[in-house]
Amino acid sequence: MQQATKQPAVLLVHDYYQVPGGEDVVVANEKHLLETHGHAAALYVRRNEEISRMGALEKIRSALGMFFSIRTYREVRRSIRENRISLVHVHNTLPLIGPAVYYAALRESVPVVQTVHNFRLLCPNALFYRDGHICEDCTKKGLHCAVKHRCYRGSRLQTVLCVLSTRLHRALKTYSRLHYITLTDFNRQKLLALKQIPPENVSVKPNFVEPSETIVPYAARENQVVYIGRLDALKGIRLLLEAWARYERSGGGMKLIICGTGPEEAWCREYLTREKLKQAELRGFVPNSAARALMGQSKALILPTQWYEGFPMTIVEAFSAATPVICSDLGNAGSLISDGVTGFKFPADSAEQLAQTLNRLQHAESISDGALKTYQENFTAEANYRQLMAIYSKAMQKSGERNEPSCG
C-alpha cells in the first residue's frame, strides 16, 4: 500500500492590527485551508495592542525592531525547528515583527513567501492615497516625500523610522530574496516598480470566500442596488450620492441601500434630506452574513472607490451570489471587474457616468451568470488551494536549488 505523501508544514506569520481588519480574516482562512488539506500550520503572531502595555524602554526596543528584532529572529528560528517548518508564509510584519522574520527563515534555509496586502514596500502609509487624492510621490520622487507629509501614522518620527528601515533593507537587498503573492495583477505591476524584486518571484493569487448559501434568480430579485462599506470620502460615498441624485431625477426606479458607518455619515444624512432623495436608505452597520444575503437579493453591488484599494472582499462575495458589481475603474478594485462580463466600470471622477451606468442593469441576467462563473473558476477555496500550492512548490524548488552543495 502506497504511503500518503506528507504535506509540507507551514509557519504563518502575522502582526495583528489594533482594529481587526481583512488581513486578519485572510490569515485565519488560510490556516484553516491548509489544515483542511493535511498541512501542519503553525502561527507566529504579535498584536499591536501589546504596545499600549509597554514601558518607555520596551517601546524604544520595539521601534528599533522595524530595522531588526532580535526577539523575532530568535523566536521564529525556534518555531521553525520545533515545528519542522518547510516554508514561512508572512502577512503583516509592522510594527512588532519586522524584517528579522525573513532573516530567521533564510538562516534556517527555509523559503519565505510574503503576501502583499497593501503598498507598504513602496509607500509608507501603504495606501498610495494622501490628502484626498491618489499619491505615488514616494515611487516617483523618493521616500523622503513621506517624511514631509508624516505619512506613517501621522507622525514625522515614526515615518522617519519606517523610511529608514525600508531604505536599509532595500540596500541590503532583503526584498530580492523573497517570493511574493500579490492579490491582483495591478498590485503585481506596482510591486515590480521595486526593481530588485525578480518578476519570476511574484505570483498573483486572490483571496477566497465561501460560497453563498443561496443563489436568487436575477429576475426574482428586489429592484434595488446596495453599497456596503465605510462611509468615507476615499470610498466614494459622496460621489455615489451625487450620482444617485441624478439617477432619481432622471426617473430611475431602483432603490439604493447603504450599509456602513463612518466619518461621512452625518454628511450623507444631510445630503439625502437636502436633495429630497426618496429612494436611498441608510441602514448603518450590517453584519457580514446579513450583508451577503442583501447582496444576493440585489441587482448590483456598487463600489465607487476613489483609491486603489487592497482586495475588496465584497466584490468576491457579490460574485459568489451571482451579483454584478458596478465599480470605479481604479486600481485593484477596477482590475477585478470585467466590464460587461461580471459588472460595469465607470470613470472614478464622474458622478454623471455612474448615474448612466445604473441604467445598464435593465438587462443584466448574463452579467449575473458571468459573475457566478468567475467566482467558481477563481475565488473558491479549492481554486485558491491549487494556486497556493503552485506558489509554495515554486518557492521550495528555488530554495532547494540555492541550498544544494556545489559540485566544483
Question: What do these predicted ranges mean?
Answer:
Residues D339-G340, F344-A351, N359-E365:
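Conserved acidic donor-binding segment of nucleotide-sugar-dependent glycosyltransferases
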Residues D24-V25, N223, Y227-R246, P263-R269, ...:
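A conserved mid-protein helix/loop that constitutes part of the nucleotide-sugar donor-binding site
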Residues R107, C135-Y180:
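Membrane-proximal helix-turn-helix segments that form the acceptor-binding/catalytic region
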Residues F186, F208:
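Carbohydrate-associated surface elements
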Residues S366-A390:
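A short, well-ordered alpha-helix in the C-terminal region of glycosyltransferases
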Residues I315, P324-C327:
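Short hydrophobic beta-strand element within catalytic cores of glycosyltransferases
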Residues R269-S289:
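Nucleotide-activated donor-binding/catalytic signature segment of Leloir-type glycosyltransferases, i.e.
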Residues G296-G310, T323:
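Acidic donor-binding loop of glycosyltransferase active sites
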